[in-house]
Structures are given as C-alpha cells and as structure tokens.
Amino acid sequence: MNATSASLGGDTRTPIAAPHATHKFRLLLRREFWEHKGGFFWAPFVAGAISLLLTLMAIIVGEVVARRAMADGKINIDNDVTINGLDLGALTSKMSAHDLEQFGHAVDLSLVTSSLWPFIVLGFVVFFYCLGALYDERRDRSVLFWKSLPVSDRDTVLSKAGSALVVAPAIAIGVAVVTMFAFLTLMSIVVLFHGGNPFTLLWGSGNPLSVAMHFVASLPVYAMWALPTVGWLMLCSVWARSKPFLWAVMIPVFAGIFVAWFDVMNLFNLDTAWFWQHIVARSLTSVFPFLWLTATHMNHFNGPEEIGSLLSLRNTYAVFATPQLWIGAFAGIAMIFGAIKLRRWRDDN
C-alpha cells in the first residue's frame, strides 16, 4: 500500500533529454546571424540595390543622350537600313549567328559584373566579422556570460568560423543571384522599349541560369579558399589585447617587408614576390570571392569570349587540385584550433 502510494505520489515526469550537438550548433549559427544581421544580410542587399540604382541612372542618361543624338540625324545600319531612333529588332535582324554568340558572351559578362557588388561587400564583412568575433566579447566582458552557458569553446569558435565560411557567403550568393535577375529584367524592359525581343536577345543568347548555378557551386570553393584568412583573423581576435586590426595586418605586412629587405641585402635566398602572394595576400585577402582564379591561372581574362571557360565548373573546381588551396586550408584549420585553445583561458580585457 505504501509502495503503491509512493509510486502514485512520486514524480512521474519523463526526464528531458539533453539537446543534440547539431541542434546546439544550429542555435549558435542562428545567434551569430541575428547578432550580425546587418553585415550578413543588409550589407550585400544594400550593395545590390545600389548597383541596380546606378544601372537605372546610367540607362536614363543613355536614353537622354541617345534621343538628343537622334534629333540631329538618323541611325544607319550597314549602309542599307536607315531608321529613326534605335530599333533593336532591325539591329538583331542584321546579326549573324557568330554575332549572336559573341553577344551572348557579352550578356553573360554583364550578368557577372552586375552581381559583383554583393561579393565585394562580402569580403569586407567577413574580414571585420572575424577580426571582432572573439575580441569584442572580451572587450565588453560578455565572454564571461557565454562561458557560463553549457556551450564549449570549440562549438563557439566553430560556429563563428562556420558563419564566416558558409552562412555569410551563402546569403551573399543569394543576394547576388537576385541582383543579377533584377538587372536582366531591367535590361529586358529597355529592349522591349526599343522594339526588341528580350527572350531572343538576352535570355536566349545569354546563360543566366548557368551563371546563377556557378555562383551556388562556388560556395565550397570559397569556404576552403577563405580558411587561412578566417583562421588568421580569428587567431588575432582571440590573442590581441587591443587593436586586433593592427596586429592582423601589420604582422604579415612587416614580415613581407623583412623578407624583401633580406632579398635586397642578399642575406637569404628568398623569393619576395612568392612570399607576398602566398603568405601576405593569402592571410589577408582570401575572404574576397573569386581570388582562387589566380591559383588556376584563370586570372588573365582577355575578353567576353572567355566568359564560358571562366564559368566552367571544371575550371572552378580545378582549384581543389592545387597545393595553394590545401596548404592554406590546413594552415587555417590549425589557426582556428589555436583560437579554440586560446579562448579557454583568454578572457582578459
């Protein structure tokens, strides 16, 4: 009877299971996003909007200038067709298959350039995010609060690295794709206004879907290529007592200056150009997209006709076969590991 009463009166609530490690990591990624939403989302969004606004302003100026020129004369096409105003339908009828192919390359190039602004902003956002990721929490003493929670230093640092390597570039890619299609829509309106067929002249000759898929497929390349800069900046962020920007920039820059001085003095047989390219530049600029093209010898772009090879997934993923990527990636992983170790005891101001 007593045993029965004890069992009936006892606490029969089911114990709550501990959250899974992946769920905890997702929460950390979400926290990083909401704390840095201005940089991760709004900065590339505003950059894309500004690029579209400048494009619209350029179109308006071009229309005004063209109409003033039309008021003074006529447009002659191959000394055969003479029209008043700009008739893109008549222009298209005079284009050969080779001309349309070349025009398609030019369209693809314009799509890439129209979407570059969010990627440029991404480089600066990731750079300064990593630089302050572990320093700001020590400066405002919030690191003491976060360390009181059941979250390891490993998960905290890795969530910040994951935000820089995956979350921020994924958002920038999405914004860049939206900007690209908005630019294409804007140009389609201009083509329609001048009597052309945008589906034939722009959407058909160009490859907007291929360009968009290339941006999406380049995400793992960016994550691997940016590792040395992310690792170096986070290591400086957790190590520096003050002015992490100066430490992060001046150490590799002064190292490059010393190497150049040793080279001039013939003290050591050092390749100054190699050191600046593979050590200094890789440690500071790898967070800017598409710089991996230098490793695959695709940095020499000779015109719109080469846009196809530039957007080739085979050429993009060829960087995985280069030692520059893997050496930099291992160095970045080692520095992130060092940042984890340093955060365990570095909570000073």
Set out the residue ranges of the language-model regions:
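Secretory targeting signals
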Residues: 55-59, 93, 101-123, 162-238
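Membrane-embedded or membrane-proximal helical elements that form or frame transporter/channel pores
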Residues: 66-130, 134-137, 305-320, 327
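Transmembrane helix boundary and interhelical loop/hinge segments in multi-pass membrane proteins
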Residues: 129-147, 158-161
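Short helix-to-coil transition segments within interhelical loops
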Residues: 148-152
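Alpha-helical transmembrane segments of multi-pass membrane transporters/translocases
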Residues: 224-226, 294-349
